[in-house]
Regions:
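Short amphipathic alpha-helices and their capping/turn segments at secondary-structure boundaries
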Residues: 1, 126-128
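Short N-terminal targeting/anchoring amphipathic segment
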Residues: 105-122
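Active-site-proximal flexible loops/turns
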Residues: 11, 120-125
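Intrinsically disordered, low-complexity cytosolic loops and termini enriched
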Residues: 15-16
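A conserved catalytic-core segment of Leloir-type glycosyltransferases
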Residues: 2-12, 22, 27, 31, ...
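Short alpha-helical scaffold segments that flank and stabilize functional sites
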Residues: 36, 125-126
Length: 128
């Protein structure tokens, strides 16, 4: 499982520059996950990010699950604020994101073997 909270993360192609937080790191996360799923010892990879509903952006960001491939998915967790927030405001959303992630994981048939946290905000969530 990859945790990545900032920017507008969706299946490729990456929409570079639509926000200050949507850049090369989004491409890196998608590429890392797509390489990971190609391994013989990996059967499923999810990228967990923040779900939001904001007219300025693609409605896909409000979809709870987006399939990139048969075994590679983006899971979006809602937070208290339903709209897009930039990284400077993201800290206030971490408690509700963490709660949503714990709820999501408690409903999964299998827990992730590995959690890869991208950046400090995701690391704070992963530590719980």
């Amino acid at each position: 499982m990859h945790l990545a909270l900032g920017g507008c993360l969706k299946a490729p192609p990456v929409s570079y520059g639509i926000t200050p937080d949507t850049g090369g790191h989004i491409a890196y996360i998608l590429e890392a996950a797509s390489h990971q799923i190609r391994r013989d010892d990996v059967s499923n990879v999810i990228i967990v990010t923040r779900r939001f509903d904001d007219r300025r952006f693609d409605p896909i960001h409000n979809m709870p699950i987006e399939d990139i491939d048969e075994n590679l998915h983006i899971v979006r967790i809602g937070t208290d604020r339903k709209y897009y927030v930039e990284k400077e405001e993201l800290a206030a959303e971490l408690p509700s994101f963490t709660k949503g992630l714990i709820e999501y994981l408690s409903n999964c048939q299998r827990r992730p073997d590995v959690i890869h946290a991208h950046f400090a905000d995701a690391a704070q969530v992963a530590s719980v």
